[in-house]
Regions:
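Binding-site signature for planar aromatic cofactors or substrates
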Residues: 1-131
């Protein structure tokens, strides 16, 4: 098991900040509103606006994210991604976005994250691997 039930609940109920990097190491961070865990090892993101992050993920399919209230929920998640522009995951994010906010633009892709590591960002424990 990688993520606990608490971690999954926090992800589903929060905005996240996703960090990516180019193959040359140039970083990019963006807020993500549509993010939810599918199980204790995978998280799904709806890509409606990503430009630089998407290009980074296509060239370097790794990312890290924290939830908006990292002081209260001090976890950093790291993983590998797959990008889907059609199929089951894409259909799932299109329906999810439509149900949640009918005025939101249709997602361009679904980004499936396989969580590989979880770290603490809590004062005193920052950088400690949790899972």
């Amino acid at each position: 098991m990688v993520m606990t039930d608490e971690m999954m609940e926090i992800i589903e109920s929060s905005r996240a900040y996703v960090a990516t990097a180019t193959t040359n190491g140039v970083p990019n961070v963006v807020p993500i509103g549509f993010i939810k865990p599918l199980d204790n090892k995978t998280v799904l993101i709806a890509d409606s606006y990503m430009v630089k992050s998407r290009a980074n993920l296509e060239a370097n399919p790794k990312l890290a994210f924290v939830v908006q209230d990292a002081a209260k929920y001090p976890y950093q998640f790291k993983g590998s991604v797959e990008i889907f522009e059609s199929g089951e995951y894409f259909d799932q994010v299109v329906e999810w976005v439509k149900e949640t906010n009918p005025l939101a633009p249709k997602p361009k892709a679904a980004i499936l994250i396989t969580i590989e590591e979880v770290y603490s960002v809590k004062v005193g424990d920052a950088g400690k691997k949790i899972a």
